[in-house]
Amino acid sequence: MANAQYEKGKIILEYSKNQVKKAGECIRKENGDIDKSIEIIQQYRAAHLYPLMIIKNLVWKHAQKINKNAIIARRLKRLPTIIDKLRRKTLDGKTPNSIAVTRMSDIGGCRVIVENRLELLLLDSSLDKSRTTHNSKVKDYIKNPKQTGYRGIHRIYTCYDKDEAHQWKGFDIEVQLRTKLQHLWATTVEVVDLCEGRSLKTNPFESNPSWIEFFRLMSEFIADEEGFVYLSPHEKNF
């Protein structure tokens, strides 16, 4: 069954990366053959499925050694979300959006949720020591939380980067590592976005400052509870 799933997921990219990049530019500028550009982006998205399955399996083996009850999920970013990301303003609300779709590292992504701080750090360390043909770089939002208060560890895997040639060489897959409380925080942000019509996650600089401050403070208290930071009694009773 697993082998059948792998074979079904082997969707080969039918276009060059340059064609994909130009399709993204066409969509962002809303100039040119939009329908054809969307078709190209859709196929590029689908081609991420096989490398996503490979990376998910790699990460899952490490997670199971840390906690057999760890939760893992994978997804391909929805096409409307990719298009929105190409067209919307940047997160700082100032610089123009010039992102190339071929540089989006989260079209294919998986998330691992572990119990606590220790398990998170052990899993990250285990992945660091992993011998693999895939290169990875780390974005540590534990040491450097986002301005919104988001915390977690992201690992960007460039698939088969150490191989001379491979059909899926160079595809990026993002892996998010979170504790249960960090995941609860992130899920709550998404729920507020949905129910209140906010954009705390995607465009925080255009969102209600009160919500932003609320979630930033909540993140600080959660980080203190889990041992990532220390808040003095004075800071807790601001």
Model-identified regions with their sequence ranges:
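An acidic, glycine-/histidine-flanked metal-binding catalytic module
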Residues: 2-47, 168-238
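Surface-exposed, low-hydrophobicity interaction/linker segments
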Residues: 34-94
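Hydrophobic side chains in well-ordered alpha-helices
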Residues: 55, 120-126
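Short, flexible, solvent-exposed loop/turn segments with mixed acidic/basic and small polar residues
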Residues: 93-105
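A short, structural micro-pattern
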Residues: 104-106, 147-151, 167-171
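Residue(s) in the substrate-gating loop at a strand-loop-helix junction
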Residues: 112
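Helix N-cap motif at beta-to-alpha junctions
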Residues: 115-119
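Short Gly/Thr-rich strand-loop-strand
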Residues: 127, 132-164
